[in-house]
């Protein structure tokens, strides 16, 4: 079953509309909540008058920041830590009177219907005392009066650094020293389903049905926000319309949970708009990089120095980890004896930066891979050859986090496949020294990516399996299907171990913190690796129990038993069907024992996935237009559990990477920090008309510590596209663009400065 492109187990329900998402489960009599957002970018609420809103017919309750529990809580979807030093930053309140960005949450209305709730918002009167707004981290990191958060006087959330060797000496010994600066934009996840939840009370407990990647973590954070025992909360996650990391944060679930307690436990739906999703949930961080490198006369890297300054926005979210995670890429993959990495994550009066597909690696990869091309150009070397000269060959460990290692390293095979597809050598020569308005170029980039979060953070997962009366197997996990095909992969893993047809594996796609085993959720490309390890162990345990029970039923001479597609086989002969054995286990008067298996494990391992992107582009210099002619991603993600799903995963990530490179950016007003293009009309996502044919290929090297030889694939496809496109434009035009996306405005400005227009 492993390695087969079986159809998705949830495909039929989704394409026929039978799949139930959060909004499908909202009861008909549900109240509706809407949030009043601040209309300034920085300041305090001096007064708030809700009397007119409360008097409106149909309004059930109005709450303000004065009414909510005064508990600061963390929002990122990380496992909790019993060690204070490893706990996430708790800087958020359910509602606030201290406005830190345009759109901050001040009050909420609960009404009988959505129209009434919206009308009530317009009747709330607020008076502010405004403070200066700062949206640029390089300015904000020198402090503001007052600081954005009182405990961070310089507005620096966290500073990270490491040193390997002696960078200063390495630079002195270098033949050539190159310095460059790069900047990446704020972008938004743009998942199909906006964050939505429905909360109600039952038997004195709060039940929250919501669209999340992290149901067990949502439960804990609601408890922290409300100051109540976590066992008083139940979180249910049905089908989810995408997340890409935005729903790896606890968003408005604590507010919704609080609101139901204020209306007698009646159901309350909190469904935010697309505009609110852009401004009030999470974004990918904008990060600025200053890079320095020294190379010897043969092009070997002798020293590397990175300074990263990350725009965190108004609250901490995942910010303490994003830029630091990016720093790890600076020391991986390329051999260099002297390395320095330093990162500052800075509060600003902007929408909050959080987790997004790649978790800081798309930003740092853009900087590193653009820099590698710029170095190669400076020293007159082919960019591919320069990379090959400096890449680490074979097995290697992270110098700082040695449990993290490239146990298999297929990067050279990936590069060979990508270069062959794009005809690298021929086109590098063909497109040299072009003139005219229309020019072509080829570019490439590569990446490395960890699988999961161990040893930086906890990795734990749980699985439960039951042999049903008909001989099929029920599978229940705390890990979440968020559209990526996880349920199909877990079903394949179970079927592989039990030697069953996948149609006989019935996976429960709904996570319920009262019922499903504990798992931290969908993030860090961890599930097929971490949860997959537990699924394999649980299936093996179930198999042992099935065969042990079979031995009790069968004659002594039939001792060597095995499972084979619904049968217990004694050698080559069928001994008893799994269905009949299951009936015996449930209903035998003399030997009834329902066969179940449950495993919860801490998974202490990590492995590095790698890959590359090659792109060929055509540039219209006068129009500032880029047309992608050919593009390919090649991934070493170990053994592919489901090749078709893997290909689809890569294609989706490549589309996201192309948007990151060409069109996507959240533009903020300089004076207020308010998003100026926070709609799907103005925020330029890649469409079908913009997307070229996308090629995905793989190098399948079985990873020795992956449960089935597999490793990360969920996030890596989104990483290398943007720098590959930028480097292709560099080859085509000779102009180096050090900030993405490469919009027509940015291209024309660069071409004018270079004298091409």
Annotate each PLM feature.
Residues 239, 243-270, 486-493:
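Thiamine diphosphate
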Residues 65-66, 227-232, 261-268, 297, ...:
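C-terminal catalytic domains of large/alpha subunits in multi-subunit enzymes
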Residues 72-77, 120-123, 219-221, 244-250, ...:
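Short acidic, glycine/serine/threonine-rich loops at helix termini
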Residues 1-154, 177-180, 264:
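Flexible, low-hydrophobicity surface segments
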Residues 4, 10-13, 82-86, 154-197, ...:
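Glycine-rich loop/linker segments at domain edges
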Residues 97-98, 229-231, 236-237, 262-273, ...:
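Conserved catalytic cysteine-centered active-site region
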Residues 144-226, 390-472, 599, 676-688, ...:
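Helix-loop-helix junctions that connect adjacent transmembrane helices in secondary transporters/permeases
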């Amino acid at each position: 079953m492993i390695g087969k492109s079986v159809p998705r187990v949830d495909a039929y329900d989704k394409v026929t509309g039978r799949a139930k998402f959060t909004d499908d489960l909202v009861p008909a009599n549900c109240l509706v909540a809407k949030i009043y957002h601040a209309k300034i970018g920085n300041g305090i609420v001096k007064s708030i008058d809700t009397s007119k809103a409360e008097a409106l017919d149909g309004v059930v309750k109005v709450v303000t920041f004065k009414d909510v529990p005064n508990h600061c809580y963390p929002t990122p979807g990380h496992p909790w830590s019993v060690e204070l030093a490893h706990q996430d930053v708790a800087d958020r309140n359910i509602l606030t009177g201290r406005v830190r960005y345009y759109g901050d949450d001040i009050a909420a209305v609960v009404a009988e219907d959505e129209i009434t709730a919206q009308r009530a918002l317009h009747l709330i009167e607020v008076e502010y005392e405004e403070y200066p707004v700062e949206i640029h981290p390089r300015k904000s990191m020198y402090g503001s009066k007052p600081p954005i958060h009182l405990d961070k006087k310089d507005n620096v959330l966290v500073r990270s650094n490491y040193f390997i060797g002696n960078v200063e000496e390495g630079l002195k010994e270098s033949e050539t020293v190159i310095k460059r600066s790069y900047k990446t934009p704020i972008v938004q996840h743009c998942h199909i389903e906006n964050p939505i939840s429905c909360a109600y009370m039952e038997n004195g407990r709060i039940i929250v049905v919501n669209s999340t990647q992290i149901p067990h973590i949502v439960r804990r954070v609601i408890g922290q926000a409300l100051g109540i025992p976590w066992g008083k909360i139940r979180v249910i996650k049905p089908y989810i319309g995408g997340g890409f990391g935005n729903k790896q944060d606890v968003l408005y679930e604590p507010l919704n949970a609080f609101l139901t307690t204020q209306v007698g436990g009646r159901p309350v739906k909190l469904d935010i708009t697309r505009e609110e999703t852009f401004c009030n949930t999470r974004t990918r961080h904008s990060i600025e990089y200053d890079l320095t490198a020294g190379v010897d006369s043969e092009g070997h890297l002798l020293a590397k120095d990175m300074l990263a300054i990350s725009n965190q926005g108004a609250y901490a979210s995942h910010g303490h980890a994003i830029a630091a995670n990016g720093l790890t890429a600076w020391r991986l993959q390329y051999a260099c004896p002297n390395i320095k990495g330093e990162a500052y994550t800075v509060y600003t009066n902007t929408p909050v930066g959080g987790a997004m597909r790649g978790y800081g690696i798309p930003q740092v990869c853009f900087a590193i891979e653009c820099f590698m091309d710029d170095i190669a150009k400076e020293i007159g070397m082919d960019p591919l050859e320069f990379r090959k000269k400096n890449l680490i060959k074979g097995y290697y460990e992270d110098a700082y986090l040695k449990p993290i290692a490239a146990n298999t390293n297929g990067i050279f095979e990936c590069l060979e496949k990508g270069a062959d597809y794009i005809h690298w050598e021929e086109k590098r020569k063909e497109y040299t020294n072009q003139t005219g308005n229309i020019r072509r170029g080829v570019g490439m980039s590569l990446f490395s990516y960890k699988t999961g979060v161990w040893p930086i953070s906890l990795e734990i997962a749980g699985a439960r399996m039951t042999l049903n009366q008909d001989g099929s197997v029920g599978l229940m996990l705390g890990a979440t299907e968020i559209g990526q095909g996880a349920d199909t992969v877990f079903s394949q893993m179970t079927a592989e171990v039990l030697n069953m047809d996948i149609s006989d594996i019935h996976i429960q796609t709904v996570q319920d913190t009262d019922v499903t085993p504990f798992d931290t959720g969908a993030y860090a490309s961890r599930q097929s690796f971490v949860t997959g390890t537990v699924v394999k162990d649980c299936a093996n345990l179930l198999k042992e129990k099935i065969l042990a029970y079979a031995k009790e039923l069968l004659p002594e001479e039939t001792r060597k038993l095995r499972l084979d597609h619904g049968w217990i086989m004694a050698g080559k002969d069928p001994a008893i069907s799994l269905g009949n054995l299951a009936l015996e286990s449930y209903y035998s008067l003399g030997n009834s024992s329902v066969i179940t298996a449950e495993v919860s494990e801490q998974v202490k391992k990590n492995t590095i996935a790698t890959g590359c992107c090659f792109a060929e582009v055509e540039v219209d210099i006068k129009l500032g237009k880029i047309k992608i002619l050919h593009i390919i991603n090649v991934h070493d993600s170990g053994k592919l559990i489901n090749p078709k799903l893997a290909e689809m995963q890569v294609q989706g990530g490549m589309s996201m990477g192309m948007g990151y490179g060409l069109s996507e950016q959240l533009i903020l007003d300089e004076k207020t920090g308010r998003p100026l293009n926070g709609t799907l009309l103005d925020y330029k996502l890649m469409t079908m008309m913009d997307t070229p044919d996308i090629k995905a290929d793989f190098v399948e090297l079985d990873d020795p510590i992956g449960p089935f030889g597999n490793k990360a694939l969920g996030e890596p496809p989104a990483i290398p596209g943007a720098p590959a496109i930028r480097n292709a434009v560099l080859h085509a035009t000779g102009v180096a663009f050090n900030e993405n996306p490469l919009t027509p405005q940015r291209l024309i400005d660069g071409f004018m400065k270079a004298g091409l227009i």
